[in-house]
């Protein structure tokens, strides 16, 4: 099991933000995290990444408790790309991706063949070979997202956390990015708003509402008109496409 979470709870200013969150994700599985605005998706992502302390939780990566991993070792096992990742304007794509090797290097270490191989592999995974020398301020929104995901991949993590990476991208780039993400050889936990994207590309879904998990399972086993009505307060029809995926239409 790549990542397991048991009874995760978060309190901020004495208020329960997340309560009793539990789920598991297998190696190389893509897990979609869904829920309305304010349901706790970003808080859960940031807690898993170690940026917000949990009031209680057992979080393990490949059986190793996160609480026992030093920060540098944690960054070798888990990578996080937040919603609004940024970079210095004059850094090139290759410079940014190379920053992903920081957890594997100490000050004044020489750049190694292993570092180069990890960076090149990450660049190829996100199809950035033709953009290596382009600076950050010249990249489109989709190119910036791919660049930051490549940086995270250069960490060589077991688990990759992506907080709404397709927001503000047009449909073409949403689909392109989701195809690249789901082809990665790592476990991906990805926060999404689009139910159709989640149903098409994720093997498992976790539905959050008011800081609690209300459903978890494969898209075709949990996405129902009743669940959508209860969670997002909209009516929906669900059909199966000729490709075997779900198509959700809103009334």
Predicted regions and their residues:
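A short, proline-enriched helix->beta-strand linker immediately N-terminal to the Walker B motif
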Residues: 154-158
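Catalytic Walker B motif of ABC-type/P-loop ATPase nucleotide-binding domains
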Residues: 160-164, 169
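Conserved ABC transporter NBD signature motif
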Residues: 57-65, 74, 134
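Helix-to-loop junction immediately C-terminal to a conserved catalytic motif
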Residues: 49
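ABC ATPase nucleotide-binding domains
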Residues: 230-251
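The feature captures the beta-strand-to-loop junction immediately N-terminal to the Walker
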Residues: 34-36
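Conserved ABC ATPase "signature" region
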Residues: 98, 113-131
């Amino acid at each position: 099991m790549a990542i397991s979470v048991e009874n995760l709870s978060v309190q901020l200013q004495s208020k329960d933000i997340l309560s009793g969150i539990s789920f598991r994700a297998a190696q190389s599985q893509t897990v979609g995290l869904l829920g309305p605005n304010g349901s706790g998706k970003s808080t859960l992502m940031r807690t898993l990444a170690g940026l917000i302390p949990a009031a209680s939780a057992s979080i393990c990566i490949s059986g190793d408790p996160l609480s026992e991993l030093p920060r540098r070792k944690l960054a070798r096992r888990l990578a996080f790309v937040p919603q609004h990742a940024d970079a210095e304007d004059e850094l090139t794509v290759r410079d940014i991706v190379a920053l992903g090797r920081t957890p594997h290097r100490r000050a004044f270490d020489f750049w190694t063949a292993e570092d180069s191989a990890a960076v090149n592999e990450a660049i190829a995974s996100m199809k950035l070979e033709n953009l290596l020398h382009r600076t950050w301020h010249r990249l489109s929104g989709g190119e910036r997202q791919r660049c930051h995901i490549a940086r995270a991949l250069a960490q060589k993590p077991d688990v990759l956390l992506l907080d709404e990476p397709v927001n503000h991208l047009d449909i073409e780039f949403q689909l392109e990015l989701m195809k690249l993400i789901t082809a990665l050889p790592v476990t991906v936990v990805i926060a999404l708003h689009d139910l159709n994207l989640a149903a098409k590309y994720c093997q498992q879904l976790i539905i959050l509402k008011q800081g609690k998990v209300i459903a978890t399972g494969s898209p075709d086993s949990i996405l129902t008109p009743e669940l959508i009505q209860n969670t997002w307060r909209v009516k929906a029809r669900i059909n199966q496409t000729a490709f075997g995926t779900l198509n959700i239409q809103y009334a």
